Structure formats: C-alpha cells, structure tokens
C-alpha cells in the first residue's frame, strides 16, 4: 500500500475520531438536558399535586372570560374572576358546573362530577320504602288516580302514545295532615323501578342568594340524568305560596325559588320519563301559576276518612296485631269524631303500648277504648280551613 493511501486513511480515521468525541460530548449534554427536564417535570408535578392537595374550595363555574380566566361563584355567595389551571379540560367547564378551587388563589384546579355536590337524597332499589298499596288502608280512588298519573306513563308509555295524548307531568296531593299522602307516595316508590328523589320544600330555602334556585335546577337535572325518575316535593307550600310584593330579601328569595320551579316544570319533555309529585296541607295557599294544567295536571284530594275508609284503615293496621276476641273494631269505626289515618294508627299503637304496660300478649277492647279517648282528646279540633 502506498504511503499516500496510508496517509489518507489516517487523516480520515482522525476526522472520524474527532466526530465521535464530538458526538459523545453532545450526547453528554443531551443526557444532562434530559435529566434537567425530568427534574423540572418532577418538580412541576409535585407543585401541581401541592396545588391540588386538599382541602380545596368548592365553587360553581358561571362563565368563561378567555381560555385562561373565568368567573366562578363561591359558596359564600360572592363571584370571583379566577385563573384556570392549564391541566383542566376546557370541554368540561359548562355553566353551573361544580369546580374545585385553590384555597388561597381560588384558581380552578379541577372539575368535580355532579354527584360530589349532590345533597339530594336519591333512593336506590335497596333503599326504597317497603310500603305497599296493601299497607295503605282505603284510598281506592286516590290509588287509582296516582297510578294513572305516575305509574302507567312510566310502565306503559306506548298506551298514551297510541291514544294520542301526552301523559300527565305532575300531580298535587292535598288534604289535612295525616290522611295518607306521604304513605301513598312511598307505596308508589316501592312499586316502580324508577329512581325516587325526595326533597322537602323547606330545603330549597338556603342562606345565600341564588342557592335555592340552583338546588331546584340540580334536582331536575339529576332527575333527567337518572330517568325514568320520580321527584317528590313534600310540603311544597313552603316555597310555592301565592306571590306578593315582597318586602324582605328572604321573601324575594322564596319567590325566586318558585320562579325557578315553574321554569323547570315548563322545560319538561313529555318523553323524558320524569314525573313530579307534590304534597301539601294547604292547597289554598299555592300559587295559581303552579296549579295550571301543563305543570300539575292532576290534583288529588285526601279528605278525612269516612266510615268505610276508617274500617279499611283499622283492618289494615290491626291485621298485624294480636287482638283479643273482645275487640270490636266496628264500635270504634261508628264513632262520630273526625279522625285522620294517622290518628287511627296512633290509636292502634297506643292500645298496643297499654297491653305492653300490663305485660299482656294480646290487645283488649279496653285498651282500644283508653287509646281512643287519649288520641282524640290530644288531636283536638281541626283548623277551620280543613273543614
């Protein structure tokens, strides 16, 4: 091999050697850069975890300003302009969405699922009442009407579609206290597979401005999400009284709750499989706007029981009791005093307690006589508007 060729190969070898050293140096720089970036990523994740660490503040997303800031409402009733963490999915930020806020900066650090802020009791299959229609003595007309209003549209919706009519959306149960309104609703909840949501009207009256209407929206949103469902609002007269020129902020807030309730009732799709049951002792105080057809299509009255109803209620309650042969239920039924179904239940319970007090295993007629006198005297007279 000639000296010139050997010299050329040596020069090329040296060049390749320098390039290799240069690549090794660059590789070292890249490795250090990767380590630095990993360290920064680890620090950033630790910082993000620290920002997201509990306790956080729950708030309500109202509206976005731009991609990085938004307006949120706090549980204290104030609104704030806050930053949105870059890791938060913007697609989940819808109006009235519940969000988690940083406890110091109030920045939005996450979106909470709807169930997190749900103070609304939802009864599952295992939590539904065990009351059946057979446990409710009498009330045959009321049972039939509530079945047609609530059960049939949920179980046989095709029947209404073939006839060409819209099923009733809501029903109002009204009558004196203790006439079986709530107990019949429990039987409805037991006999249907629908989700049962029960709230009391007074629960919508909250301390802070806007909380009551928001809770109404949450109730009906939850009902639509879990359809088929039944919404039962007990003591609805606490939020649905006739509107007037309110002079206090509390009265105005109650009227806002009523307006939101009217809006939600109007927003129902007949095919949504959501039924509303409301109960009250004072139907005469309910706002007429709520009573019109299209909102509460059926009004079912629960009067004080007549002689036949008393007999059926007594028989339903005493069927599970150990009675002496001397017990004459008919003598209690024929008495002229106006008593409710709850009074009849109290009479039977009191008679049973008298037997327990005397260490007896059977209830006698004398126990019923003493219990009747005690309960009727305690119940007194009914207010004028129930007569």
Swiss-Prot record:
Protein name, entry field: 26S proteasome regulatory subunit 6B homolog
GO CC terms, sorted: cytoplasm; nucleus; proteasome regulatory particle, base subcomplex
InterPro entries noted in UniProt: 26S_Proteasome_ATPase, AAA+_ATPase, AAA_lid_3, ATPase_AAA_core, ATPase_AAA_CS, NA-bd_OB-fold, P-loop_NTPase, Prot_ATP_ID_OB_2nd
Disulfide links within the chain: none
This protein's record includes keyword Cytoplasm: yes
Main function: Acts as a regulatory subunit of the 26S proteasome which degrades poly-ubiquitinated proteins in the cytoplasm and in the nucleus. It is essential for the regulated turnover of proteins and for the removal of misfolded proteins. The proteasome is a multicatalytic proteinase complex that is characterized by its ability to cleave peptides with Arg, Phe, Tyr, Leu, and Glu adjacent to the leaving group at neutral or slightly basic pH.
Binding site for ATP: 175-182
SUPFAM superfamilies documented for this protein: P-loop containing nucleoside triphosphate hydrolases
Keyword terms of this UniProt record: ATP-binding, Cytoplasm, Nucleotide-binding, Nucleus, Proteasome
4Fe-4S found in the keyword field: no
Protein's cellular compartments: Cytoplasm; Nucleus
Subunit organization: The 26S proteasome consists of a 20S proteasome core and two 19S regulatory subunits. The 20S proteasome core is composed of 28 subunits that are arranged in four stacked rings, resulting in a barrel-shaped structure. The two end rings are each formed by seven alpha subunits, and the two central rings are each formed by seven beta subunits. The catalytic chamber with the active sites is on the inside of the barrel.
Record-level Gene Ontology MF annotations: ATP binding; ATP hydrolysis activity
Similarity comment text for this entry: Belongs to the AAA ATPase family.
Main location: cytoplasm
